[in-house]
Amino acid sequence: MFREGSRDDAALVKEGLFDKLEIGIASDVTIRDKWSCGEIKKPETINYRTFKPEKGGLFCEKIFGPTKDWECYCGKYKKIKHKGIVCDRCGVEVTLSKVRRERMAHIELAVPIVHIWFFKTTPSRIGNVLGMTASDLERVIYYEEYVVIDPGNTDLVKKQLLNDAKYREVVEKWGKDAFVAKMGGEAVYDLLKSEDLESLLGELKDRLRKTKSQQARMKLAKRLKIVEGFVSSSNRPEWMVLKNIPVVPPDLRPLVPLDGGRFATSDLNDLYRRVINRNNRLKAILRLKTPEVIVRNEKRMLQEAVDALFDNGRHGHPVMGAGNRPLKSLSEMLKGKNGRFRQNLLGKRVDYSGRSVIIVGPELKFNQCGLPKEMALELFEPFIIKRLKDQGSVYTIRSAKKMIQRGAPEVWDVLEEIIKGHPVLLNRAPTLHRLGIQAFEPVLIEGKAIRVHPLVCAAFNADFDGDQMAVHVPLSIEAQLEAKVLMMAPDNIFLPSSGKPVATPSKDMTLGIYYLMADPTYFPEEHGGKTKAFKDEVEVLRALNAGGFILKDEICGSRRDETGRGIHIHEKIKVRIDGQIIETTPGRVFFNTIVPKELGFQNYSMPSKRISELILQCYKKVGLEATVRFLDDLKELGFVQSTKAAISMGLKDVKIPEIKKEILKDAYDKVAIVKKQYEDGIITDGERHSKTISIWTEVSDLLSNALYSEIKKQTNSKHNPLFLMVDSGARGNKSQLKQLGALRGLMAKPNGAIIESPITSNFREGLTVLEYSISSHGARKGLADTALKTADSGYLTRRLVDVAQDVIITERDCGTLNHIEVSTIRQGSEELLPLKDRVYGRTVSENIYQPGDKSNVLAYAGDVLTSAQAEAIDDAGIESVKIRSTLTCESRRGVCAKCYGLNLANGHLIGLGEAVGIIAAQSIGEPGTQLTMRTFHLGGVAATSSTPEIVAECDGILVYLDLRVVVDQEGNNLVLNKMGALHLVQDEGRSLSEYKKLLSTKSIESLATFPVELGAKILVNDGAAVTAGQRIAEVELHNIPIICDKPGFVHYEDLVEGVSTEKVANKNTGLVELIVKQHRGELHPQIAIYADANMKELVGTYAIPSGAIISVEEGQRIAPGMLLARLPRGAIKTKDITGGLPRVAELVEARKPEDAADIAKIDGVVDFKGIQKNKRILVVRDEITGMEEEHLISLTKHLIVQRGDSVIKGQQLTDGLVVPHEILAICGVRELQKYLVNEVQEVYRLQGVDINDKHIEIIVRQMLQKVRITDPGDTTLLFGEDVDKKEFYEENRRTEEDGGKPAQAVPVLLGITKASLGTESFISAASFQDTTRVLTDAACSSKTDYLLGFKENVIMGHMIPGGTGFDTHKRIKQHLEKEQEDLVFDFDSEFESVAG
């Protein structure tokens, strides 16, 4: 099916001297005359006695070449001197046996056979060309019905189907010669050959212009695309029917003799034999003038045999082999993980590599790894042989090998010499990000295990419990140079995903450093002494050494010598440093001996987070080399100090808080009160469950804090070892500590629901049998989840890599004026991600001034922000910054360095050719796998991340913004809408209206912002002054209340008992509650409020959702602020990353979420218009233009807006997640990009994973690359077709130059799988998924792959056009680029207008 050119091009192909690859459909002539070396007529394979190939069979030497080098079949010619001679006896050419891997043959078919790919792959290519349905075609192809090819003068129609009875009837009526009707492949061949594609194309275009129905247009456009593919290529449609079948070279389908006279064979041989047998039988039958029924059956069987050969199982039952296993057809050879693409072309096994178990090598330098001598000897063998020959120690390779095997002394000397400066690559599977392969200088060691530096373990995610690593030797000078310059471990100390240090001390090292740097615990004054003062650090170190620095003495923890000198390592001392007297400890002075001087004196405790910050600071101030030295010193110091400190944990170190009994008693009392409330009917069962869980969550936190305070206390001026371990970040966390000494807390059932009664014991006290049994659920769920999710995460990474693999940095600056706007991310009043972190390393698109001072420029347009600039912008209180982004980059291919910003792995501007797409995919995929390993449980109120009350953080004035409130009888303000917030502003003596105006125009910044929920009770009036710590509002956590805002009398509307409502007696309380239930009728349950008891004047209506409990009675008089009904919030299940990974997948695959929310299509005011077919009609009316937009909303959905609410375009009207496609259609590209980036970040942020926005932006960019044609104008584009933005603009430019009408299009959001398959390169798409469909599609339109991306070049064995290969590739491709002029488009602003 590939068309690489004639046989003469084979040499070029072998050399790799081609820069594009075209695929097409092979004609019968090509198969027979160009590809084939002979026809196979017999199904035989090899002779059972001689084991030699049978002549004319599937392994024939005459056709395929000799099985032994330079030897013919009969043995007449046996030497290289006869090269090229064709034996006159056996007809075999004397040549190399490897030609049997290249030479093909063919089978001449008795009747034409339809290629199953073109008929069965959706959409059916043959069906679309002929305009026939797949089922009709199937009946013709498999000899069930006739199809009319030429109706002649009869009343039949071309392509009409005739069954046997009808056919006989027609023959009787008109005679056999009056028309032509056939069956099978022959019929399809004739129909395809007679099809005039040019006129069909014109006819389809006409019909497309005239058709108004969207569905019909889409159908026509699809057919048009296939027909156009044939017309514009050199393919003929009848080539989709085969007259000859190519036979794969025999060495690609080997027959291997096993012990005991049996053979192992490739499944293809069986499939070919079936075809040959049936074909030969059919030829014989046709010669014998056999009855039509038998012939027809034989033809059908041949068609099925060829189907099975190409794609077994695609039609009918698959052909089974031995052991009832389906045979692997040609399609299977290409498809899936074990297919040709992924197994052999994208992933090859590598020579000069080995693997072994890893152990820790604390004595190594950062750039070293320990390589076992035996391994090194094997890996560096060729280098050793060359050196031995150069030295004259040996003269032949064989003798050198023998010498190596003997282990002669000079071999070891040579090995030592060679290994110097020759880096090796270490790799640990799974390689989730680029830090999974790093280069090291090998150091020869005894033993059989590879030694690894402890600081690189984090990057490899390695531990020493039996992990294995692979070693690879870079052979060429270039490869060695790349490994040295780019891949050495010291160059990879920062994560490319976030720029945070990855080589940070952990476990023992952290503990040792923390111990050394701990706060003073020994104060001489308390022991009747005096604080010692030292003139400099050297004196302190002398005193330490004099004290022996061994910590045994009970009182002060040091060993004094005879003169009474010596100091405690944690003693408070004074010392002069840089001319200043500082209070510190000897430990800190000791630690500072390894800190680079530029960083100053570090005089504070050092948990792991601080160490990480110190490393980052060190890199910024003193550069890479000094940082790596510092890291090695940290490692050394950490291990030594943790060993000397000999910190170990005993059972007594786990202190149980004394207040535990009291707190538990109090909690049981509270739970009893909640239960009583439920029994009295005040709250629902859901609320009771929810409140109970809140109580226990609070108890858990209280006890956890009490325990932490308890172990923080020092005894005998010594630290609690448990506290040291947790606080330093070496091992354990607060939650594990809580389980050891406080209580285990709430547990989840296997289904995720939280069990109300917690485990009140801790591990020190021991668990009861019941408690142990409950807690075993969680432990098992964790393990099962881990196993299942790792696969999901790996698949997500694969899809991400595939969609972004060809995004590389192609130029320095694209010159775009487009930008995106970023601001601080807040949750309530808490700052989750400060602005400085979001803008660091990004390019500013316009000047940034100090607010109120235009002369002070903080950053100029085009600046890539440094951390100092980012900090200055944040400090200046600037709300948002306009930055350039890959989302708005206008590079012709790939993206530009300026739009991308800094390379986070080294803090420099990203270089040309850098594979940023793959880095982005790895950055998002790698934590996915990590997260699946830990399952987080957030239970009860913790899960809703909200608290029952809002407290002012500082003094100020409270301003209500966008809030509708009603004052209840107690004088509290109740919130009636969902979108408002409370703002705390500085008291500047302004009026309330001024404050509101300034806030809504963002002219002033609030000190704190509190978003408030529907039904919240605000305790302070609008505009009132509040003080820090004052309660501002109470939030209703367990119900969504429906509150009345006007006085009047209640009237039930459509609240029909037994239909839309039901009275339910509460099992526990015995009280009867009126609950609105789900119903199918045309009822619209609502409560109407009338001004008078006669129900004449209507004041307002309130829609009541299903599941709500009604709190008022018919005819009851009510006051504003009273509760009409309440909708209990569902029992809160535990959240874990199971919610996270599928959510990320859902976002990047652009799937429609379940129970999606409805969003407003225009700005306006909400109104209701009754009910239609179980759906509520909600109208948004624009007050100014009078424009209306109707929304049909299911009655089961909960509305979060009410009549009269003002909404803005894109605002949610109901609960649930938003459909991304709707955001695109309603709010435009910019809003969608912002939404997707923030939503993905939200998932990772919840897990405490830090990923830079730019990585997610690249994936989103790839999802928004296509546009959908809405009006093709005079272009060659088709209606409903998805085309690349660049292609669209180029086509429009051409059309406009020719004076034609340009096409119109709207942006379209594609999921990553669809986007990967829509890539320009068919090789890349075929190696991803749907291999057969992609290849069929490409072959029909004779697609050309210009080999511009990574995957296609790896598959073709070329150098990849990225990294160090970028420049080389650029030169090769320059002539291609000349053909296509460089264009810079302003895509996004154009589309904004279309979408908006």
Swiss-Prot record:
> Record-annotated residues binding Zn(2+) 1?
C72, C74, C87, C90
User: Which CDD domains does this chain map to?
Assistant: RNAP_beta'_C (cd02655), RNAP_beta'_N (cd01609)
One cellular-component annotation, GO: DNA-directed RNA polymerase complex
Sequence positions that bind Zn(2+) 2: C814, C889, C896, C899
Chain coiled-coil ranges: none
Q: Where does Mg(2+) bind?
A: D463, D465, D467
Cofactor section: Mg(2+); Zn(2+)
This entry's comment on the bound cofactor is: Binds 1 Mg(2+) ion per subunit.
UniProt cross-references to InterPro entries, sorted A to Z: DNA-dir_RpoC_beta_prime, DNA-dir_RpoC_beta_prime_bact, RNA_pol_asu, RNA_pol_N, RNA_pol_Rpb1_1, RNA_pol_Rpb1_3, RNA_pol_Rpb1_3_sf, RNA_pol_Rpb1_4
GO process terms (BP): DNA-templated transcription
What reactions does this protein catalyze?
Answer: RNA(n) + a ribonucleoside 5'-triphosphate = RNA(n+1) + diphosphate
Could you tell me the EC number(s) of this protein? 2.7.7.6
Ordered alphabetically, the record's keywords are: DNA-directed RNA polymerase, Magnesium, Metal-binding, Nucleotidyltransferase, Transcription, Transferase, Zinc
Transferase recorded as keyword: yes
Keyword field contains tRNA processing: no
- An example molecular function term from Gene Ontology annotations: magnesium ion binding
Highest taxon in the source lineage: Bacteria
- Top class in the EC scheme: transferase
Q: Which NCBIfam families match?
A: rpoC_TIGR
PANTHER family, sorted: DNA-DIRECTED RNA POLYMERASE, DNA-DIRECTED RNA POLYMERASE SUBUNIT BETA
Quote the function comment for this protein: DNA-dependent RNA polymerase catalyzes the transcription of DNA into RNA using the four ribonucleoside triphosphates as substrates.
Which family would the database say this protein is a member of? Belongs to the RNA polymerase beta' chain family.
On assembly, the entry states:
The RNAP catalytic core consists of 2 alpha, 1 beta, 1 beta' and 1 omega subunit. When a sigma factor is associated with the core the holoenzyme is formed, which can initiate transcription.
Name-wise, this protein is DNA-directed RNA polymerase subunit beta'
GN (gene name): rpoC
